[in-house]
Amino acid sequence: MGNISRFYVGDTMTDQNPINTVDSMLPIPQLFAFGLQHVLAMYAGAVAVPIIVAQAMNLPVEDLIRLITADLFTCGIATLIQTLGFGNIGGRIPMIQGVTFASVGPMTMIGAQHGMTAIYGAIIVAGLFTFIVAPFFSRLIRLFPPVVTGTIITLIGINLMPVAINWMGGGVGNPEFGSYTNIGLGFLTFLIVVFVYKFAKGFLSNLSVLIGLIAGTAIAFAMGVANFDEVGRSQWVAFIEPFYFGLPSFDWASVLSMIIVMLVVMVETTGDSIAIGEIVDKPIGRKELASVIRADGISTLIGGILNSFPYTAFAQNVGLIAVTGVKSRFVVAASGVILILL
């Protein structure tokens, strides 16, 4: 796609259309349709970390549900902070936030030795550390010339391939992982996305991923592969209780390990920010990067208070922006609202 944006007014495709900018405000129905597309693209990755942590800590199902609820709620808050911005916090770019997988190993080790309260104590301190060092770390942006940026964008796509393959197989841990049914449904969904993207016009073409997800899920349900019984039995409304597992405790070895995780997150965020900046034609300089990293820090701190985890940009949504060509940060802000409501 390069830097050529793909956006439709009526049935006419336009390149670099002035209404398709990072600050474009789309009609409300389009905002939430495109926003839902982003949520569905990141949902499985968003809930994976709380599931892994809960299993490692042998938490009951009730606590797992609380972790997932808190995670999605904080994902929404973090996304709104990043997309809308408040003062010098938030990059004001279409960057959806989710829990970083880099934190899984350290959190499970901290939890096994010191319990959940030590996990959240380490997360809170690491978030505060990230917020404070953001302006200093952002100076490293000069180490990211175009050749490095291009390499980062390529690596983002390559690193997402195993994720796509695992999901097509049915998800790691699924007893039917790799079955012909799962793989066939995955390819069928992929073909639907490609067909809609290639042959549909206007608004529908931009929603190719969402249409593919809905069609694939409907086919899976008709085949008896998708089961929504647990959804029907679950509570429709849940409230987030800060410090549900108790007031945070602070083990400094645990804090140090989480700070190291956040250093990795800052590098990852730098690459994702530059990639998004290239896609949406908004150059990311030192000032902008510092704002993005501050948002990661404050979101991680909030996560520690609300029983969630460290936050970073989700790379699969970077790819989705490139595929759909819809640059508006308000689309991703709508995703944040949807995540809060979930």
Where are these regions (language model features)?
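Membrane-embedded helical hairpins/re-entrant loop segments and their flanking transmembrane helices
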Residues: 28, 54-92, 257-329
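Transmembrane helix-bundle signature of multi-pass membrane transporters/permeases
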Residues: 69-72, 76, 97-99, 123-127, ...
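Membrane-embedded alpha-helical modules
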Residues: 110-226, 332-342
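Generic transmembrane alpha-helix signature in multi-pass membrane proteins
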Residues: 50-54, 104-112, 138, 162-169, ...
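Intrinsically disordered, low-complexity non-transmembrane regions of multi-pass membrane transporters
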Residues: 2-34, 228-243, 278-282, 292
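Flexible hinge motifs at transmembrane-helix junctions and intramembrane kinks/re-entrant loops
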Residues: 61-66, 177, 181, 191-239, ...
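N-terminal signal-anchor module of multipass membrane proteins
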Residues: 13-94, 102-110
